Amino acid sequence: DMGKERLYLKPESFYHENKIKLRLGLTVKKINRIKKLIETDSVTYDYDQLILTTGSLPNQFPGNFGKNLSGIYYIRNLDDADKLKEIFEPGKTALILGGGYIGLEGAAVARLKDLNVIVVEKSKRILNRVACEQTSNYFRKLHQDNNVKIVEGYGVDRFTHQNGKINGVF
């Protein structure tokens, strides 16, 4: 297992040394571009240069499509990924919906933990929205060489379940 620090683009000291003030996990309520002020729930900040890195939310299944079933996890950050360490059991199967960078990284970690892994990507190829075809081909081969099954061009319509646990995917 590698430490979380190795996953960050820069160490925390980089930001301090370069006089960059990080404000993480805040909800910005208002930006005044004329006065160069940012208003959050509790504090107002002034700024010289503003860089918005808003992150994103994972695609969620609509309605009751699996929301109350055990075994469905959404991953968007390191804390989400850490929670999976507890449930990864060698020999179990991980079905990963989404063949972007986060999904492929999850697949790699699951294989390192000796899980059987299937990645389902609804686009025509993995990394379709973020990389060229050659990059997709490289990562497809890398994952397949490490026994990850990749299914492209198919989405998931529904789960079947019994006693609150998934027992089929269509």
Region annotations inferred by a language model:
Residues D1, K67-G71, K113, S136:
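Glycine-rich, phosphate-binding/catalytic loops in enzymes
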Residues Y8-L95, R158, G168-F170:
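FAD-binding core/adjacent interface of flavoenzyme oxidoreductases
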Residues S13, A108, R140-K141:
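Alpha-helical segments flanking ligand/cofactor-binding loops in enzyme cores
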Residues H16-N18, R111, Q144:
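Short polybasic/polar patches that bind polyanions
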Residues R23-E39, Y45, K113-F170:
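A Rossmann-like FAD-binding core segment of flavoenzymes
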Residues K83-A131:
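Rossmann-like NAD(P)H-binding beta-loop-alpha module
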